[in-house]
Amino acid sequence: MERKFSEQEQVRRDKVTALEKQNIRAFSQTIKPTHTSEEIHANFANKEREDIEKTNTIAVLNGRVIAQRGPFLVLQGRSSTLQIYVDKKALNEETLIILKQLDLGDIISATGLVSKTHTGELMIKASDIKLLTKSLIPLPDKFHGLVDREDRYRHRYVDTIVNEDVKKTFILRSKIIKLIREYFDNLNFLEVDTPVLQPILGGAAAKPFITYYNALNCNFYLRIATELPLKKLIVGGFERVYEIGRIFRNEGIDTTHNPEFTSIEFYEAYSDMWGMMERTEGVFRYIAEKLNVQKLNFAGKEIDITKPFAKINMVDAVSEKIGVNVRELDDKKALELAKQHDIKVEKYFKLGHVIEALFEKYIEETLIQPTFVYGHPLDISPLAFKDESDPRFTQRAELFICTKEFANMYTELNDPFDQLQRFEAQLDEKNAGNEEANEIDWDFVKALEYGMPPTGGCGIGIERLIMFFTENDSIREVLLFPQLKAVSQK
């Protein structure tokens, strides 16, 4: 099918032809810049015009033309803009031809003297302009812009050109990830990489993406967590490890979920759930300190990051809310209780699943300020250490902010006999219809048989953390290329 162009798109293509007839390339090799707009601002912003011109600084500046104001072109750099003053009387014939065919969105290289306008704005007095790249599609106009969310996500490369705040969000995302690494590196954690393709499903309760490994003639999973290989490294004597990487879960898409996302998981020998709470609160505080923030507006609420994070027991919170001590229930009575509270019961449900459902229904919505919820049921925590005072529950905790889960942490199970029993229970759940249940990872059981020291482990969703610190309400706002339904590319 032949592609149809708008009138403006056709005009730009005609300009390419006109330039080529003048032996001027519309798509050129680079010209090495001597400065960036950021460097020019840093070096000359606080100087007077006369003092700047005395330095006789000739700059070669590359950038995208995003505006034209009389004799001035505005070039967009990495994080700032700079004006180019165009005096046609001072320019050669080739430059004049380029200017005649120039459009907003074109990428140029401007050479000239660094100076300031009479109103004190930095500029370059152009002595030469070269065309580096002709833009064939007009940018959205500055009045209407690119405002439709799906259009913005689908054409992120345009979004970051015309919406400066969006670009700043992703620059901040990169900075936050660097700060996370800095925090754990300072604590002598070792960053590692583990396989994305896994032969066994495990490490989290999630539905996987499945692929076929031709060379091995079998199905593999895109990892749903990095937990099991990282704990194998703890067995191997590394003691403190972390991994920042992509995770894949074949599940729904909403404001806080994307099938492909980034997580950090970290594991520390001779620690536990309480130590992981300390590390998790520590990384949040470290980021806040480095970004110089104390309070954030997130999901319509003001969150004070300087106060100690609260801690509540999941089972106690549910019992208090519904007026029933759920610790005293068996599976049968728990299922009866679920029906009383209009909770949909699955075939594999036990006491722990009911407690989790009651928590999600009644307690989650009350968790606004940063709160650790601990003491999860064993039924929903197959990799966590049992609570010694009541083995139906575990040393597991989650961090909630504004009703959303941000982190999941355990005192890790290091008993190979117990771990195998839990894997077998998970297999029973899988056979009963729970698609998120784990399989038996025999190699992990074998690793535990060699001996894993008492260990604390935690996973944090990077996107949710970045949503929090950038005060965004949707995960798509912090993913450069979020998943969207396919549309025609014509």
From Swiss-Prot:
Subcellular location: Cytoplasm
Reactions this protein catalyses: tRNA(Lys) + L-lysine + ATP = L-lysyl-tRNA(Lys) + AMP + diphosphate
Alphabetized GO MF terms: ATP binding; lysine-tRNA ligase activity; magnesium ion binding; tRNA binding
One GO CC term on file: cytosol
EC number(s) on file: 6.1.1.6
Residues that coordinate or bind Mg(2+) 2: 405
Keywords carried by this UniProt record: Aminoacyl-tRNA synthetase, ATP-binding, Cytoplasm, Ligase, Magnesium, Metal-binding, Nucleotide-binding, Protein biosynthesis
The keyword Metal-binding belongs to this UniProt entry's keyword annotation: yes
InterPro entries assigned: Aa-tRNA-synt_II (IPR004364), aa-tRNA-synth_II (IPR006195), aa-tRNA-synth_II/BPL/LPL (IPR045864), Lys-tRNA-ligase_II (IPR002313), Lys-tRNA-ligase_II_N (IPR044136), Lys-tRNA-synth_II_C (IPR018149), NA-bd_OB-fold (IPR012340), NA-bd_OB_tRNA (IPR004365)
Similarity section: Belongs to the class-II aminoacyl-tRNA synthetase family.
Quaternary structure annotation from Swiss-Prot or TrEMBL: Homodimer.
Protein name: Lysine--tRNA ligase
Organism: Metamycoplasma arthritidis (strain 158L3-1)
Organism placement in taxonomy: Bacteria, Bacillati, Mycoplasmatota, Mycoplasmoidales, Metamycoplasmataceae
Gene field: lysS
